Regions:
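Short amphipathic alpha-helical segments that predominantly mediate membrane engagement
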Residues: 1-47, 71-186
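Short hydrophobic alpha-helical membrane-entry/anchor segments
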Residues: 55-72
Length: 186
């Protein structure tokens, strides 16, 4: 089964077998993978993985990509983090070309930069459970028709994903403040 579009897989500091596992999971569904090894850009992390799926985040993604492939990628990311330890571990960016079923078009990015192994694992584990929550959370931001990107961060204190920042085509940025549940425009 081949889905439309090309998946993106950029990385640094990961082993050949890790590259092969992620690449084959993406290629098996999307057919084409934009793979790129980057120079180390952040000395705080020995490894970085960025995966961009060419379909929107939602139930349809998990049907097309399959839970088996999703579990394989999740398991690999968690194992990479465990092997590299907490101090200089792994950062991961998992992104989608929109949010389904509402046809929300901004790129959705899950940014996983937790230093603590357990929090990293919990963040990865909880992504699939956000399918019904994210469309509701999007309502806190101004109109999504000119929103280009929304970034989610994992909150280690409250053990949940929160919207962090939304970027708009006019250059404006909104930051969500989870403690006060307010938006701040930058």
């Amino acid at each position: 089964m081949s889905a439309e579009g090309s998946a993106k897989f950029h990385y640094y500091g990961i082993a050949q077998f890790e590259i092969e596992v992620i690449y084959s999971a993406l290629k098996g569904v999307f057919g084409s993978v934009d793979e790129l090894q980057l120079p180390i850009e952040d000395a705080q992390y020995v490894s970085m993985v960025e995966i961009e799926f060419p379909i929107p985040f939602g139930e349809f993604f998990f049907q097309i990509f399959s839970m088996e492939r999703w579990y394989k990628i999740k398991g690999l990311l968690k194992e990479m983090k465990r092997r590299r330890g907490g101090r200089r571990g792994v950062k991961a960016f998992i992104s989608f070309c929109g949010i389904a079923p509402e046809e929300i078009k901004p790129r959705l990015i899950f940014s996983v930069m937790n230093k603590n192994n357990r929090h990293f694992e919990m963040a990865i584990e909880k992504i699939e459970y956000l399918v019904d929550i994210i469309p509701v959370q999007m309502q806190i931001f101004p109109a999504t028709n000119n929103m280009e990107e929304i970034v989610y961060h994992y909150d280690e204190v409250n053990f949940k994903w929160n919207p962090y920042r939304a970027n708009y085509s006019d250059g404006s940025e909104y930051y969500y403040l989870p403690k006060t549940k307010e938006l701040k425009r930058k």
